């Protein structure tokens, strides 16, 4: 029994995750400590994140073990309950006390629980269960609408908190999972083009030096009209394609006015970071300086100057990648990306290997979760994406994120042990 357990165990998923957790703890330790030779010059700015994170890592490893041992059919059977409880928690958090102008946490016995993190698991399971049912044909428009509803209900509740960054994760889960299930590409385009229309409209409406953005928006709309004309035999889809995009272009300015001021500032800072270097663009500016100053080999462990000077207020959470790049350089950053890539690629390979449809779809959802978090977080620290507050899995300080990431790794390991089950 023991030999069979380890024979089917996918170490290429587990080992990179363990190494990432260890690197995260080392970085958090570095943030709170100053080398002896610098103590006369720098005073450590204690966050206490390292000590607390050790506790969350231990909890996460226990959760990972349990997730690996429980028969995965339990997840499929409990998906509806997980989803329902998650929605109730998201509603409950709207009535919780506001922290820094947002309602994202529920205080349970001195610990802050972030329901939106756990809702990501529930949405992955619920989507996988719905799409795995044989009666739900992938070429059905109804399947796409119901699948989108599963995602958009929690999406809207999380936007209400407000937490725009976390809400975008749910959209990132939808399209890869739908594509993997075999949903008609034209139906996916029908849902994806409004998002692109919204982005181009935001660029056109918020950029003072507009340049080519209005022309890009016009060109994109012409492409939509041409696509609709080419599919004129399917009148419903053609009308829907044009109608959705026109509606989005008209609604985006209204939605912009309903955003919180800090959300508008983050988007504007992303579009023009140089316009407010000493204000909202400070973290991104300092993050890029820290990453660049690390060079190829880095400044060595504990010797990051931006960290020592506390130029990055969120260096233990959102901008932890900047500390890693400064102290371990390009080489350390590359190792980090390779470790994440191994987990994601191995997870996708597992999705093709596993016999059970629910398990296959869930594996793709988990890989999408990790890929989106890594791309957005690193993009945020390098100025390629807006500051969203998404954590770097296994690395950033935070109990909810650590436990969820460990749980999802445990689920992948579960699938690898039972890949032959239908």
PLM ranges: what are they?
Residues 1, 377-422:
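A juxtamembrane structural motif centered on a specific transmembrane helix
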Residues 1-6, 42-44:
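Cytosolic juxtamembrane amphipathic/interface segments immediately preceding
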Residues 3, 10-12, 16-19:
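N-terminal topogenic module of multi-pass integral membrane proteins
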Residues 5-7, 143-144, 309-312, 354-355:
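Helix-boundary and loop/linker segments of multi-pass membrane transporters
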Residues 16-22, 27-28, 39-279, 325-382, ...:
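Hydrophobic alpha-helical transmembrane segments of multi-pass inner membrane proteins, especially
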Residues 34-38:
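Juxtamembrane/transmembrane-helix boundary motifs at the membrane-water interface
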Residues 168, 173-187, 306-328, 391-392, ...:
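Interfacial segments of multi-pass membrane proteins
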Residues 269-317, 328-332:
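TM-adjacent membrane-interface loops and short helices in multi-pass inner/ER membrane proteins
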């Amino acid at each position: 029994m023991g030999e069979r357990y380890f024979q089917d165990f996918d170490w290429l998923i587990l080992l990179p995750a363990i190494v990432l957790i260890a690197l995260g703890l080392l970085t958090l330790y570095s943030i709170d400590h100053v080398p002896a030779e610098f103590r006369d010059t720098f005073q450590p700015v204690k966050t206490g994140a390292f000590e607390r994170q050790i506790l969350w890592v231990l909890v996460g490893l226990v959760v990972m073990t349990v997730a690996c041992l429980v028969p995965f059919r339990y997840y499929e059977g409990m998906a509806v309950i997980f989803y329902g409880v998650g929605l109730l928690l998201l509603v409950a958090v709207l009535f919780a006390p506001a922290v820094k102008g947002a309602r994202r946490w529920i205080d349970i016995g001195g610990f802050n629980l972030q329901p939106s993190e756990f809702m990501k698991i529930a949405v992955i399971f619920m989507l996988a269960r719905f799409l795995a049912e044989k009666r739900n044909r992938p070429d059905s428009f109804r399947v796409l609408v119901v699948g989108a509803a599963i995602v958009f209900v929690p999406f809207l509740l999380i936007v209400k908190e407000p937490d725009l960054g976390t809400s975008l994760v749910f959209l990132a889960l939808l399209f890869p999972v739908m594509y993997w299930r075999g949903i008609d590409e034209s139906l996916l385009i029908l849902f994806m083009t409004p998002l692109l229309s919204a982005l181009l409209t935001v660029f056109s409406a918020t950029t003072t030096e507009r340049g080519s953005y209005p022309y890009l928006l016009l060109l994109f709309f012409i492409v939509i009209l041409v696509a609709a004309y080419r599919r004129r035999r399917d009148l419903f889809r053609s009308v829907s394609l044009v109608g959705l995009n026109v509606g989005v272009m008209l609604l985006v300015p209204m939605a912009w006015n309903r955003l919180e001021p800090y959300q508008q500032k983050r988007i504007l800072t992303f579009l023009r970071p140089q316009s407010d270097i000493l204000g909202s663009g400070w973290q991104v500016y300092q993050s890029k300086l820290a990453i660049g100053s690390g060079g190829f080999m880095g400044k060595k462990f504990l010797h990051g100057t931006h960290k020592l000077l506390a130029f990055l207020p969120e260096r233990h959470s959102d901008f932890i990648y900047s500390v890693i790049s400064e102290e371990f350089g390009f080489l350390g950053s590359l190792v980090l990306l390779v470790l994440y890539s191994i987990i994601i690629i191995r997870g996708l390979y597992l999705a093709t290997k596993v016999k059970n449809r629910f398990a296959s779809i869930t594996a793709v959802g988990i890989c999408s979760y990790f890929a989106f978090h890594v791309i957005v977080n690193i993009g945020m620290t390098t100025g390629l994406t807006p500051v969203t507050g998404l954590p770097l899995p296994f690395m950033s300080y935070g109990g909810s994120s650590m436990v969820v990431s460990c749980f999802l790794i445990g689920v992948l390991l579960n699938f690898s042990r039972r890949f032959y089950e239908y």
